[in-house]
Amino acid sequence: MAKQIEFDEKARRALERGVDKLADAVKVTLGPRGRHVVLAKAFGGPTVTNDGVTIARDIDLEDPFENLGAQLVKSVATKTNDVAGDGTTTATVLAQALVRGGLKNVAAGANPIAVGSGIAKAADAVSEALLAAATPVSGEQAIAQVATVSSRDEEIGEMVGKALTTVGKDGVVTVEESSTLQTELVVTEGVQFDKGYLSPYFITDTDTQEAVLEDAFVLLHREKISSLPDLLPLLEKIAEAGKPVLIVAEDVEGEALSTLVVNSIRKTLKAVAVKAPFFGDRRKAFLDDLAVVTAGTVVNPDLGITLREAGIDVLGKARRVVVTKDETTIIDGAGTAEDIAARAAQLRREIEATDSDWDREKLEERLAKLAGGVAVIKVGAATETALKERKYRVEDAVSAAKAAVDEGIVPGGGTALVQAATKLVELRDSLSGDEAVGVEVVRKALEAPLFWIASNAGLDGAVVVSKVAEGKEGFNAATLSYGDLLTDGVVDPVKVTRSAVVNAASVARMVLTTESAVVDKPAEEAEDHSHHGHAH
């Protein structure tokens, strides 16, 4: 395949155009008065959303060089979403401002490596300043405030606050679509563990990249499953019953895994295979926990139960199973409350009896998984489009609330970043040459989120930024007033804001230090040249 290459300033400017196109589409959604973006879908109606990462994921540009820039910023949004679950629009706006400011200086002759180094030092300093300024979050009301800001909806905020308070810090909150118009909170028995699907072919929902099984069987196996003849008899019985199955084993590999994948692709049997978490005795004990939760039996050759001879009776059951690339959640297992309570009591006795802190910690982790339960927020709306949009907002709110419990909160609405920018003056003055230029680029870029929040609310962004930079008060875009944002409940989780700054800085440095860009030559062009030979 022939390639096209651009060098130096031309390559960097093409990347910048791509960054700008994606960021301009995303930044209109920033703030409580941000607008919506409509995304056309290949199937079904359009998606209306104000979620940065959803918009970013949907954008591919025609010009291959510009597309490289767009993909780099997309990675900022995705990475921030993976770490903190929210703040994707802020990260995108910061990345755009950093790229723009950095390239302006590089074009004027600054050394890109030194500017990049200054940007990295400034990002670390901002990260530390935000952590130092954080206010810890505890209590339902404080969590609800964070979720309300993220989702722009008080009802959702209160629900998320209640959900997280009910299941605790280590508990699980999942978001489902409801068949009614109401959005409601249901706390059910459930377990989550940190292992995801063994093959992406098991995914059933391509939007969320999840495998979702409704009313499923659960097969628990003590050892590896690799032989197809061992697994086939049981698979046939499961297929006859017409239900999906979750397989949890030490590992599933070889022809057993490929058969499950082929059946999933052909839709003859809905199955998902995951590895059991932990190692050694802890893995065995956790499989026994799952057996209690799902009312199943662990297939264990040591006890005379082999996979080849196992019948439907060894399988556990669950109302719903959700598997992502990193974790598996089993909701409403068929185990009785008495059995689960007895198992939890046994774990508590073991916790009291153990002398080892490490064992105690691991047993408490198992107890939290077993007894913590799962809070399910069922999202309802009048139309499919409204339902999707609301579901995105609820998912963001849950992520933001969890992030707030982790690292605390700072004043929201871009104010914390403008306040952190004042801390960079000292750092800038302590550095010399182009490193100081890099710090100044970050200092200016930190004003961008507040600038666009104010602009989207119909005000002059520059005026609002200078007013917030002068005083102690922040800008509340929902009420168009200035005040103490922590008291008003306009707050952002530190984890979200920090991730946005660090990820944006990392991509900006990449763009600044790019000297050439290589892309595939479009097919038609290549063909045209081959036909015309040497004709000039």
From Swiss-Prot:
Subcellular localization: Cytoplasm
InterPro entries the record matches: Chaperonin_Cpn60_CS (IPR018370), Cpn60/GroEL (IPR001844), Cpn60/GroEL/TCP-1 (IPR002423), GroEL-like_apical_dom_sf (IPR027409), GROEL-like_equatorial_sf (IPR027413), TCP-1-like_intermed_sf (IPR027410)
CDD domains hit by this protein: GroEL
GO cellular component, one term: cytoplasm
Keywords assigned by UniProt, alphabetized: ATP-binding, Chaperone, Cytoplasm, Isomerase, Nucleotide-binding
Residues that coordinate or bind ATP: 29-32, 86-90, 413, 476-478, 492
PROSITE patterns: CHAPERONINS_CPN60 (PS00296)
Pfam families from the UniProt entry: Cpn60_TCP1
EC top class named in words: isomerase
GO BP, one annotated term: protein refolding
GO molecular function, one term: ATP-dependent protein folding chaperone
Catalyzed reactions: ATP + H2O + a folded polypeptide = ADP + phosphate + an unfolded polypeptide
EC number assigned by the record: 5.6.1.7
UniProt similarity note: Belongs to the chaperonin (HSP60) family.
Quaternary organization: Forms a cylinder of 14 subunits composed of two heptameric rings stacked back-to-back. Interacts with the co-chaperonin GroES.
NCBIfam families, sorted: GroEL, PRK00013.1, PRK12849.1, PRK12850.1, PRK12851.1
Function: Together with its co-chaperonin GroES, plays an essential role in assisting protein folding. The GroEL-GroES system forms a nano-cage that allows encapsulation of the non-native substrate proteins and provides a physical environment optimized to promote and accelerate protein folding.
Protein's name according to its UniProt entry: Chaperonin GroEL 1
Organism: Nocardia farcinica (strain IFM 10152)
Name of the encoding gene: groEL1
